[in-house]
Each structure stands twice: as structure tokens, then as C-alpha cells.
Amino acid sequence: MSRFPFPIPHGWFGLCFSHELKAGEIKKITLAGRDLAVFRTESGKAAVLDNYCPHLGAPLHQGCVVGESVRCPFHHWQFNGDGECTDIPYANRIPARAVAETIPLQEVNGMVMAWYHPEGREPYFELPKVEGLNGEDKWNELEYMDIELPTCVQEVAENDVDQAHFTYLHRMPAFSETETVVDGPIKRS
């Protein structure tokens, strides 16, 4: 088909649910063809770095979390969530260029989210906090379900705005009509 492949739109993408990333854990997650090292520090802060150590390219997800940093499995260089090298065990000083590439991250509404823009531009909007899902005002645990769809992001978005097709094509019960408000990149319905 001439429509494929679609470009990946820019915006915030879910890397994992917050409860899936325990303190001291590292996961390799691929976003838009790029491998990322997603980790939670010992104090509980989520962070995301390019998965490959800037020293010699070792996969950081195969390392371990030490305090507030991830330690490379090859030479034990350590990088914090801001990409700063915090330790080189055999060096007296850390070179200025020893910096891991970071990805903008937000942890909100029970999800660890990363920003993607094909031209590397910084985020131009924050994700809204949903009342009742965060911190002190959290009133209930969410239920989670993973669904794998053999499709692309654009088709998911197109289907979301074509509510009528669910009833006629997929033979699902009709959705109740709701008011939809679009405020910049945010859709509320």
C-alpha cells in the first residue's frame, strides 16, 4: 500500500506503567526504533537514557542501578537520570564529554512517558494530571490490560475519531455520545 509506512508522530509515548518499574530496576524499551534504558533509582525516581553507553556502546540495560545512577556493565561508568557521569572507578576526574543522552520524561497518571520528536525538538506541552490518579489524591488502583494490535499509531488515532465504525464494522455496542473538546494537543471526551 502506498500509505505505508506512516511517520511516527511527535508527542508523549508510554514506555511502561509505573508499577512495572521497581526501584533499582532497568528495562530496555524501544521507542521509534531507538533503544532506551528506562530505570528507577533507589530513591524511586524514573529516568530514561539512550541505551548505549557513550564510552564504548555497552547496553546500559544490562548494567545495574547504583543509588541514583545506572552503572554500565563493561567498565562500570555510572550515569544519573540527567545523563551526567557520576563515577568512573579507575579515573581521577570525569571527562566533560562523558555524558549519556537523555530523553524528556514525565511520570504521570500511573505511566512512565517519554517524548519523541523526529527532529529532536523539546516538548512543547506537559501531560495533564488526571484527578484521582496521582500522589496524595490517588483514590484507587487502575486495572491494566495489554492489547497487541497489528497496526500503526496513525490508524489507532484515525479509529479513535471514527466512533461509528466500532458499531458497524466491529459489531461492538454503540458508544454513548459525549462532548469532545480539543485543546491544542489534548483531546478530552
Task: Give the residues covered by each predicted segment.
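Rieske [2Fe-2S] iron-sulfur-binding subdomain
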Residues: 1-46, 80-189
